[in-house]
């Protein structure tokens, strides 16, 4: 089965259905199936999180967002609630697979250079060329509503701006592909993974106390996000310990965890109290719900096989959705259906997001059929 050698790579990037088969040698069949099945569900939640607006303006000005109170709470529940746990699960499983395989450091770095770093560098270039092409077409064909989509901005960047846009350090701190902060942090955490392992082995209690403090207090860590370190550490501890997070989540009843999640979500968005702590607790509750939900996904063989198939394209969807697809689909959608009332706002929220998901997966399938080598390179295979 293809790409079996990459089963220790981050779950968000290059792990394929073949990994489930390989991991059965060490993991239980149930655990490996849960990991394989949940990827595309998590990615769908990530896409919903990234098409979430409380205010929106067309090029040239003019507010077009007129969300209703009901619509606002729907978006808050999905994008700022249920989707909160997706990235934590990705970090946790990525670290778990990395530490569980116990590969040598040189092997890990070699694999990650191909599976994470190469796509991390290539995808911004793909996006720059895409938007330059859109700008060229808009200018030549005089397509006015695309003027605000395409650009040649990268041609004016200084060396410092190139570095800032690729890595997010310096400038405004935002990467050109803003959602690639996940990959950046994963690269850094992979590089320092032996150090984290050593620190944990030497002082377990102190290490756990430190990462909890960093996460819940929101300590500023310049090179990586606090949640990245926290959930990566959770995955490391999971791999090094006897307990199973899936088993832990399975023991929690739905009627126990759902009220906790909803209560924290309501407190956060209604009263805006203790935002860092509340967000962290809510994300962890959502994290456990998603882990628990994976048990449902593997019960039906057809459902499981379908999820594993689409999971092959989860990284492609991740890479292409937030700039390329969102820019085009949202621009065209708002041109046809301006968000002038609550109904059209909700229609945009669900319609654009669903189209982004379908288009991203569809483009991935098409590219894989037309040019498998290019698909593999862009996806770190």
Predicted regions and their residues:
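Membrane-cytosol interface segments of multi-pass membrane proteins
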Residues: 1-212, 301, 309, 338-381
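Loop-centered beta-sheet repeat module
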Residues: 192-200, 205-243
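Aromatic-anchored segments of alpha-helical transmembrane domains
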Residues: 44-51, 124-125, 209-222, 258-271, ...
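Conserved active-site loop/cleft motifs that coordinate metal ions or position small ligands
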Residues: 317-320, 376-378
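Short glycine/serine- and small hydrophobic-enriched flexible loop segments
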Residues: 96-100, 197, 236, 240, ...
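Interfacial loop-to-helix transition and helix-capping segments at the boundaries
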Residues: 74-88, 171-184, 216-234, 249, ...
